[in-house]
A protein has these predicted regions:
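C-terminal capping/gating helix-and-loop segments adjacent to ligand/active sites or protein-protein/ligand interfaces
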Residues: 328-407
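Ligand-binding pocket segment of bilobal, Venus flytrap-like solute-binding proteins
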Residues: 200-203, 209-291, 295
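A structural signal for short loop-to-beta-strand junctions that line the ligand-binding cleft
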Residues: 58-62, 110-117, 132-164, 182, ...
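Periplasmic-binding protein-like
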Residues: 189-199, 320-343
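Early extracytoplasmic/lumenal segment of secretory-pathway proteins
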Residues: 23-124
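Periplasmic solute-binding protein
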Residues: 119-128, 149-176, 206-214, 298-304
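Short beta-strand->loop
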Residues: 131-141, 153-155, 182, 267-268, ...
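A bilobed periplasmic-binding-protein/Venus flytrap-type ligand-binding module shared by bacterial periplasmic
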Residues: 164-171, 298-313, 320-321, 329-333
Length: 424
């Protein structure tokens, strides 16, 4: 009887095991051994992690060769080390990088190619003869990205210029996140903003263009009410941002005037959207910085050779940047939103840069040089004679600004370190 019970029990176990196997999916051989070894991020999937979405640009193959390609990065553009190494592995060319804040400095670089031009930069550089006059070989000009008057400019990404807010600082100090240009001049927000000098920085100039578009003839009055701190470069501006210490060293290292782990007393900074990706939290799924969308100006990133005919290395890099591998690497690092939106899924660019919809939009920086000159003159004139402002706390029952209060500087701002005695 005991033997019968034992045989019956074993048979029952075998039947149960067979039933369980029939209703339990097999574990994929590609599944991670420890599913919690990597941070959980929104929308993460095995397919996306393995290679991302399908590319949509019909990019030609870049040519191979040897030698060094000197790359000028303008307007906060990034070419991460991993991306440069991948280019070298694919083509044989090595890369040397030099950073500049505006296209006016391009002739000093002896660069073979420039990355990070926006439409206004491309037009100005083409008129000055500092980029090639013809399009490079082996590249594709995507519909909607051609820049009239700058045939050499080839789109490879997007990185709008916005006001980037330090969410933690605003929350800790009882301030609301600005939602419009008008909010920037409110008593509890004005004088909290730092802007890279628009006369020398492409990023600062783009911000003035958006301010002019939103305020029209009121640009001067807006600038007076805003009363921002002006720093000589994007790197210096990021260095006095209250969340500056959270920005990755790789990002800061490719900014003019950048200083790793530097932070200051200004919770609002004018910068590219990619700054939010560079200030990601440890999870990689959130950021210390939030782009204020209503302040953004759409900015396409262009690459251009600096000479005609372009060197093989320059044309190879431009062609490679349009390929799926490069587009995915830029998006993964959050260095740019890929112009090929099909590869953006499950990347820092998709999670943190705040861009939705089509990647290709009209470049809003494109304007006549005369208009840009007039806007900058109005801006600088207004800041040289700022309007008087009432002390904070007079707009109702709201308290005055907490210490430290930023010290406002003018377009000819002194060394950004001069205000550090007010920073706790």
């Amino acid at each position: 009887m005991a033997r019968f019970r034992s045989v019956f029990a074993l048979s029952a176990l075998a039947l149960a095991a067979s039933a369980l196997a029939a209703c339990t999916p097999a574990v994929s051989s590609s599944a991670p051994r420890d599913p919690f070894a990597s941070p959980i991020v929104p929308g993460q999937s095995a397919r996306a992690s393995a290679g991302g979405g399908r590319a949509t640009i019909d990019a030609p193959s870049p040519r191979s060769g040897s030698g060094t390609v000197t790359v000028a990065l303008v307007g906060g553009a990034q070419l991460p080390t991993e991306t440069a190494q991948a280019f070298t592995e694919a083509t044989g060319f090595t890369v040397a990088v030099v950073s500049i804040d505006g296209v006016g400095s391009l002739p000093k670089t002896s660069a073979d190619v420039v990355l990070g031009l926006d439409g206004a930069d491309a037009v100005a550089a083409s008129a000055a003869g500092t980029i090639a006059s013809t399009a490079p070989r082996d590249t594709s000009t995507l519909a909607g990205t051609a820049v009239e008057g700058a045939a050499a400019a080839i789109a490879y990404g997007r990185d709008d210029v916005c006001v980037i807010a330090d969410k933690s600082w605003l929350s800790a100090n009882g301030r609301s996140l600005p939602t419009s240009f008008g909010d920037l001049t409110s008593p509890r927000v004005r004088s909290l903003l730092v802007v890279p000098d628009p006369t020398s920085s492409s990023v600062g100039r783009a911000f003035v263009q958006e301010a002019a578009a939103q305020t029209g003839e009121g640009l001067g009055a807006f600038a007076q009410s805003l009363s921002p701190r002006i720093d000589p470069s994007l790197g210096a501006a990021v260095g006095v941002w209250t969340a500056g210490g959270h920005v990755s060293q790789g990002y800061v290292g490719q900014l003019v005037g950048g200083e790793a782990e530097a932070s200051g007393a200004y919770p609002l900074v004018v910068a590219p959207r990619s700054l939010a990706a560079a200030a990601a939290t440890n999870t990689g799924a959130d950021s210390y910085g939030a782009p204020v969308s209503s302040t953004c100006i759409a900015r396409i990133l262009y690459a251009a050779a600096t000479a005609s005919p372009a060197s093989d290395g320059a044309e190879s890099l431009i062609a490679w940047l349009q390929g799926e591998r490069a587009q995915r690497l830029l998006a993964t690092a959050g260095s740019a939103y890929p112009i090929d939106g099909g590869v953006a899924a499950d990347t820092k660019a998709a999670w943190l840069m705040g861009i939705s919809g089509d990647a290709v939009v009209p470049d809003e920086t494109v304007a006549s040089p005369e208009a840009i000159t007039a806007w900058l003159a109005t801006w600088n004139s207004a800041l040289s004679a700022p309007a008087s402002t009432q002390p904070e706390g007079e707009d109702g029952d709201e308290p005055a600004a907490p210490s430290p209060a930023p010290v406002v500087t003018r377009p000819s701002a002194p060394d950004p370190g001069t205000d550090t005695e007010d920073e706790d």
